């Protein structure tokens, strides 16, 4: 519905997907980005999935917006130390991030189960 609206109007949707990995205990909620990546500016963070101290977020832009972003806001520099970026990249590349998310989901599901008599 949102995707159709954005496509019809040539508009973009800003989707802040903070906490998406744990907002649904049994399955991740489908994002608008997954349906219409060409119409969505997707924003997310690693502070819930890894640790609150991991103050690292990211933004995925539709291809037509990348050059405009770089022209207007390219002067912004990344404030995340390079070492943390490398560690995070390896965490993702190795599959450990996905395993971490799955472990946390299992723990949350276990916690959400009603107590047995």
Task: List PLM regions with ranges.
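Residue-level detector of anion-binding/catalytic polar loops
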Residues: 12
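PLP-dependent aminotransferase class I/II
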Residues: 41-116
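Active-site pre-lysine segment of PLP-dependent enzymes
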Residues: 1-9, 19-49
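Proteins with a high burden of low-complexity, intrinsically disordered sequence enriched in S/T/G/P/A and R
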Residues: 1-2, 18, 112-117
């Amino acid at each position: 519905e949102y995707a159709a609206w954005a496509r019809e109007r040539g508009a973009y949707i800003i989707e802040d997907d903070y906490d998406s990995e744990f907002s649904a205990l049994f399955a991740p909620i489908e994002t608008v980005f997954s349906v219409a990546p060409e119409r969505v500016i997707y924003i997310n963070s690693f502070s819930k999935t890894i640790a609150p101290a991991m103050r690292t977020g990211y933004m995925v832009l539709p291809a037509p917006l990348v050059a405009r972003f770089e022209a207007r806001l390219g002067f912004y520099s990344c404030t995340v130390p390079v070492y943390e970026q490398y560690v995070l990249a390896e965490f993702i590349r190795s599959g450990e991030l996905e395993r971490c998310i799955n472990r946390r989901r299992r723990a949350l599901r276990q916690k959400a189960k009603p107590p047995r008599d």
